[in-house]
Amino acid sequence: RIIRFSATTGEELEQALAALHDAGMKSLVIDLRSNSGGLLNQAVDVLDQIVASGKLLVYTRGRIPSANADYRSTDRPRVATDEPLIVLIDHGSASASEIVSGAVQDLDRGLVAGTNSFGKGLVQSQISLGPGGNQGKLLLTIAKYYTPSGRLIQRDYEGKDRQDYREEAFEGDVPPDSVLA
């Protein structure tokens, strides 16, 4: 289970995949349910470990040229590019989780199972406020991200306030690990 895409997620996954490979891994399930996202570069790192080299993983487009980027899988050694793969998502899966699940789906790398994801397809830059950055942070949206096939994950937010937007995202959601009859 990946809870959040933090600065060490790619490294932690690499260690876990190596241990699973050594133990005879035959298939892989990545649980991204209730993962609200995190760092774009860590989502790319995760994909780079499970997708063959040379593939477009995600791309970003913004109003300024520096926000436009294509992210591709590298030639790094991998241990988990051939095993059957399932990625679990739900309404709480957002942003970096949707980058991973979207690429897995678009590249036909595995099966994505669960409910619709949250729909946050925005790239944000973090700006520290105050002297030494200790008076808070401002998240500035600089781009939108697109899956390899060109899908924009971002849900429409025109004319909605923050609370309506959130409530809509979780409408009809099923609690994690629930058994539905």
Where in the sequence are the language-model features?
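C-terminal "post-core" interaction segments
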Residues: R1-A181
